[in-house]
């Protein structure tokens, strides 16, 4: 048997906790984005991330690299039916969309689940049935000559900063 170096051990994720704030991702395919979101959860004190089954594997080498060690402190749970799992937590579910209410003019509940969708398709259609509301980060550039959207990891960072700012 060849020699193997163990960098660190991660416990198997157990039961999903129902913390006041839950962050969920739906269909994130870019490993760098997922790793960054894991790092953001760690930074803001969110100890678990709920992932749809079609989200990139959190143990992908690029995810681990982008998380900068936060993968050891944030539990990632992969679930088959994201909407059903979030509903069982008995708190409102909100989704990040391009046409939602501005996070700057909406009171963001500090006991809720917040869902961020895939980079190219957003939140999956079936999950919309579970949403109590939608939020967005408005562009401050006027006219049509502007970026089409934000990177999902950047949007998550802006959102969490605004949420915790109160």
Describe the function of each predicted region.
Residues 1-9:
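A contiguous, low-structure linker/loop signature
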Residues 94-147:
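Active-site/ligand-binding-proximal alpha/beta "capping" segment
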Residues 8, 42-44, 58-72, 125-166:
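Structured adenosyl-cofactor binding patch, chiefly the S-adenosyl-L-methionine
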Residues 8-9, 13-99:
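RNA substrate-binding interface of SAM-dependent RNA methyltransferases
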Residues 29, 63, 111, 116, ...:
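N-terminal hydrophobic or amphipathic segments with adjacent small-residue motifs
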């Amino acid at each position: 048997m060849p020699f193997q170096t163990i960098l660190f051990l991660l416990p198997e994720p157990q039961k999903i906790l129902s913390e006041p704030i839950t962050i969920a991702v739906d269909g994130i395919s870019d490993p760098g984005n997922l790793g960054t979101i894991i790092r953001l959860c760690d930074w803001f004190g969110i100890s678990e991330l709920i992932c749809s089954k079609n989200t990139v594997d959190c143990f992908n080498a690029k995810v681990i690299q982008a998380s900068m060690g936060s993968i050891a402190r944030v539990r990632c749970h992969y679930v088959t039916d994201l909407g059903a799992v979030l509903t069982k937590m008995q708190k409102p579910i909100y989704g990040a969309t391009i046409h939602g209410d501005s996070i700057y003019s909406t009171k963001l509940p500090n006991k809720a689940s917040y869902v961020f969708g895939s980079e190219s398709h957003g939140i999956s259609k079936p999950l919309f049935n579970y949403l109590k509301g939608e939020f967005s980060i408005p562009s401050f550039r006027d006219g049509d000559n502007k970026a089409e959207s934000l990177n999902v990891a950047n949007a998550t960072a802006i959102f969490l900063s605004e949420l915790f700012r109160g």
